[in-house]
Structures are given as C-alpha cells and as structure tokens.
Amino acid sequence: MTANERAFLVVAPNYWHTKLERRMNFLFYTVFVCLFSLNRGDPLNNSPNGYQRTYDNIQREIANYSEIAKKIINLAVYGSAQNRSYERLALFVDIIGPRMSGSRNLELAIQYMHKALMKDGLENVHLEPVKIPHWERGEESAMIVQPLNHSIAVLGLGGSIGTPPEGITAEVLVVTSFDELHQKAQEAQGKIVVYNQHYVSYGETVLYRVRGAVEAAKVGAKASLIKSITPLSINSPHTGIQAYETDVPKIPTACISVEDAELMARMSSRGTKIVVTLKMGAKTYPDADSFNIVAEIIGSKYPEQVVLVSGHLDSWDVGQGAMDDGGGAFISWEALSLIKDLGLRPKRTLRLVLWTAEEQGGVGAEQYYKLHKENISNFDIVMESDEGTFMPTGLAFTGSNSARSIIKEVMKLLKPINVTKVYENGEGTDINYWIHDGVPGHSFMCIFMCVYVRKKTCIVI
C-alpha cells in the first residue's frame, strides 16, 4: 500500500470493518461467470446447446446460486480460508520483496509462485515465455542550488535515460500544463522543465508523467521533472512508466514530490531564478527472459471455453509491490483456491494468469494475447484486479447491454456484503487487448481507487 493510500485510510476509519470483505466481490463473480456464458455479447437466447434462453430464465438461474454464495462466504470469512490470501501475500512480499521487470527478484517471484500454484493442487500449471524490458535506475539525486541549497525528493521514471556522471545543472522553467509549455517554448530551451500540473484524476493527470519528457524535449529542454501524480503527499515521489518517441530526442525524466514542485512554483511566481542539479544513473539493458504464469480449474462441460482472472506479479523497485499488484495477483489465486477447496467444478475452464512486466506497459499481457488470440472465440470474459483490493464497491464492466444486465443480476447476490455496484469502463492494462476485440471484461473496484483514480465515474462517499 502506498503512503497516499495509507493517508486516505487514516481519514476513513469507518471503512475498516470491510477488511474481511476485501476479496469477496472478485471471488463470487468468478464462480458465477463460470456457470453461464457471456459469450462476447451474443444474444441472450444463444447457448452452447442451441436452446432458447430468456432473460427471465437467466435471472432465475443466477438466483439459484445463493447457496453456493453462502458456502464461499462462510469458507472465506469464517472458515479455514479466513485471511489466507492476506497471509500468503505477506509471506511472499516479505521473502521476495520488489519485483522489477528484468530483475533477479522477479525471476525468483515467478519460480516461487509456480511452485505454490502446483502445491495448491491447481490444474495445468505452467509457464509461458515472455521477453521483457530490463531497466535499472541506479543512483539518483536532485538538488536546488540557487537561490538556496535544498535536496529534492526524486524518483526516475521507468525507461528514462541517465544523465552524465556530473549530472545536468540548468535553470528551471515551471509550467502548469502542456499548453503553457508550448506558449513558453522559447524560454524552455536549455532548461529543466518542472511540471506543476493540477491534479484532476489519475487517468487524466498521468499524461504528464507519460508524455512530460517528450513534450519538454520538443521545445529543447535538457530534462523534465514531473510533480507526482497524486493529490496527497508526505514528501513522497512516485515512480512509473513514461514513453519516449522515436523521432524526439530522449532527455532524463523523473517525478518529484508535490511539496518540491509547489516550492519551485512559488519561487517562480515571484520571479526568482531557480537552478537545479539532476543526477541519474539509469541504464537500459537488453531484454530479459521472463514468464507469465498460468493455472486452471478445467471446466466440466465446456472445457475449451475460458473465464480468465488475472493480476500482475511484477512491481516497481522502490517498494514491496504489496498492493500494486501483489494484492490483485493473490486474490485472483484465492478465487481458484476457494472453488477447489469447496469441491466446485465450473462448467467452463477458470484460468488464472499472473502477468509479467505489466508496469512496463503490459508487455506480458500483450505477448499472451498474441499467442492466444486465434482462440479468441473461446474467451467468455476477461478480468483483472489492479486497482486496489481493500473495501470493494463493485465492478467496472465493458460489454454489451445484455451482458451488463446479467452482471447486475450477479451483483445482487453480493448485497449481504454491500458490493453491488456496476460501473462503466472495465478496461485494464492487461485485458485491453481482449476487450478491444469484443470480449467482455471487468476490473475490480474499491473505494480508494474510485475516489483517487476514477472521480468522474465513481461516486461512492
């Protein structure tokens, strides 16, 4: 969990009672989608056996799963599986630690999970090879050297080039938007551009992190520093991916804390000249060998049909990756574990995929899609959990209107734990390839991410 997530939870203590509920949404939904086909948005009256199904039939079928729902909640909340996913995750992150793309730790994490899934008794557990980026940040620092000496909290962005060993020392130009940068293009030449953009939502504001270096390079800047993409801060910079363009010069780029960005903005507004020295030892190495991890519970009636649940195993290098995305990966595993422990056998194959190199732009997911897209008609729904796991509120869903109606019926079964909402836009980095080709998809939603990431689509507090 990031410092910003902790800060949010401090002001929302009344929600801690949902601790035992944090994974139930994903688990229930996984069971139910195995029992009937969403089938890429096909009409409701299509079924594998060719008989006519009405919406009323499907409503009644879903309602009949209430006893299964009770069994799952009893096992997960009160039974032997109580807190199991949390304990599994805690052990994993304590032993393995950060899991950066291309790192030895990620390799160890994949080996660990491969063995754990086999030991858990899941079926068809195997590894699928992937080539992934290998970038290391090295030593890095930033310092205001004029008008005072002040150390800047800084984290280089993934894939950034480094600076010369002596660093880059240059005057700063502070801007609040790309438009302002372009208006001041003449002033930006030879300077370090500092973005002090206004925070709207993560989805909108993250463009400054992704494109900040490119836009600054276009106007001749030497480097770019971006205010971390968050409305909350305890002088804690965030890292993340950024994207260069082939026809634009590459310049070093990093995120700085909200406090340091606003400090320089105040200085600049007074007309004070600001000079910064930036040092980054970042290096990019040849692509490394890695793997997506796959495990299944094979379907009893339509084994060729796939319901995919997923989370990514890699993380950034400056934390344990417990929430991004250890939590998502482990509740996805827990979904299969609960079904197996209860002796349930879904009609369709329930497939778990733990992605590699998501933080580098969904590399593992893209290669998985390319490998399996010829069988796309067999994928009934794709799911990922990468937006937090505590305090669930519902699902963000993308699919046909008829499929959405079915999802809403399923979610009614979660009323006892108050997880019933169905939001728009279920896209996620690792499932977008399938969704764009017409496969229904959803992402798990929780209170924090609704407020922090999706302000325009989630109103929950």
Where are the model-predicted features located?
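Cleavable N-terminal signal peptides of Sec/SRP-targeted secreted and luminal proteins
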Residues: N25-R40
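Catalytic-core environment of secreted peptidases
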Residues: Q82-L106, H114-N124, Q183-E187, K191-L207, ...
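Noncatalytic luminal/extracellular "stalk/propeptide" segments of secretory-pathway proteins
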Residues: L44-K70, N74, Y78, A90, ...
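Soluble metallo-hydrolase cores and metallopeptidase-like ectodomains found primarily
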Residues: N64, I68, P147, S151-A185, ...
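His/Asp/Glu-rich mid-to-C-terminal helical/loop segments that flank catalytic regions of hydrolases
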Residues: S337, R348, M449-I461
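Extracellular/luminal Protease-associated
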Residues: M100-S103, A153-P252, Q320, I417-T420
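Metal-dependent peptidase/peptidase-like ectodomains
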Residues: T253, A261-E262, Y302, D317, ...
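Stable alpha-helical elements in mature extracytoplasmic
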Residues: N64-A69, A81-L89, I96, N105-M113, ...
